[in-house]
Amino acid sequence: MKEKTGKPQAFSRHLIGKSASEHLANFNQLLAGMMGSAENKPEALKDITAVEVSQANFPALISAAMLGEFGAEVIKVEPPEGDPARKVSQYGVKVKGAGIPFLMESRNKHYITLDLQSEKGRENFKKLASRADVIIDGLKPGFMDSEGIGYRQFSKLHPGLIYVAISPYGHFTSKARNFRNIPDTDLTAQAESGYPALIGNPQAPEPYNYPLKAGVWAASYMSATLATAGTLTALLHKRRTGEGQMVDMASSEAISIWQGFSIAWGFTFEMPRVRVGNFDWCLFPYGYYQAKDGFVTVAAASDADFRGLLKILGRWDLENDWRFLFDRITDDVDKLKVLEGEFKKELIKFARKDLVRKTLSYSAGAAKSKLRGKGFPIIVETLSPREVLQEEHWQVRNSFLEADSGLKGRLKIPSSAPKMSESPPRTKRLECGIGQDNDKIYEKYGLLK
């Protein structure tokens, strides 16, 4: 394939040509300017009011914080003694009167106290709901309805309201009824999803072959993200029709869906997908490997990528034994371990940055080649949390914010992941005192003191 127009040509999924580097450099510079400061830029949800009422429900806390980042006025309703989630923290450390997990999800929120089991508290909540666009209910299923302030009541009084309920099992199954008093925890949500059964070393003997949970609150963040997506979709529907609706989010369902094809695998092949550890059922190599000074991530999605990886490592001799796709993609773990052992012997000889440099050099040459099938293997460094915080790349993207912790040093917390040119998310405040905004919100919404 020749360059007839003088413009960069595309081979596979890569841009090549003499002007490609200049083009990408200019484009990067343009985007860097567009994705910079959020100052003086509009907020996408500026006209939206969301009321969050939850106790010890981190998916609800996280979802409400996401709406707040995009400009919604988020009012966090707590009982007079505060949300029990405030007490969750490593080593009992409190920042600004709350545990770090709670503080992180306090972005841009207003905090008020209401006793929903009192007549005055319920009347005040009704006043809030009458002017709200969204309610996020993170209490036990059925509690709000039993107090006369749930979706069933508000759908008649306020038909445009979007009512988002987040709980372990949702609201409308027999299990949801039977387990309604079980608190929402990330651990139980993972357990009910089948996900922990897929994690761990497949070769581990008894008693080490037990299920493993993800090292982060995966179910909480996944269910919060999906609940937020449901909320935004419901807002679009309301814009077209004027109709509100209920969004029912079950946290265990969220992480079940997150597994993707793992669930479908059992139905398709009439066999469960078992744990494969550092292997993958569809790709090989596709995992973490020891280098001279740490770990690297190695991925070769296609045969061409695999051959490119062999060339980078100087092990072209292996191609004769493993040249076909199904020689590498197999559920025979013992067979995979043979090839993995060869990779381990080579990767341990190199420093991480040297492996990355060699891979980038190979990919640059492959992109310029007029021959298809050169392959683009991937080798990147596997980073520790400390290394992530030190990465210049994430600093340029403003991926982490610094906040006054009241302790020695400043607190670093994750910022919003999507970078947007016209209506970017932002963190304007990080305060979460119990009832700190009572006076302001009570006056604004005409609540009874």
Language model segments and positions:
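Aromatic-enriched alpha-helical interface/lid elements that frame and gate functional surfaces
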Residues: 285-286, 290-374
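Short Gly/Pro-enriched turn/cap motifs at secondary-structure boundaries
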Residues: 270-281, 286-287, 408-411, 430-434
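An anion-binding loop in the catalytic cleft
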Residues: 33-36, 291-294, 351-354, 364, ...
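Substrate-binding/catalytic subdomain of NAD(P)-dependent oxidoreductase enzymes
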Residues: 235-277
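Glycine-rich beta-alpha junction loops
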Residues: 81, 168-170, 251-256, 293, ...
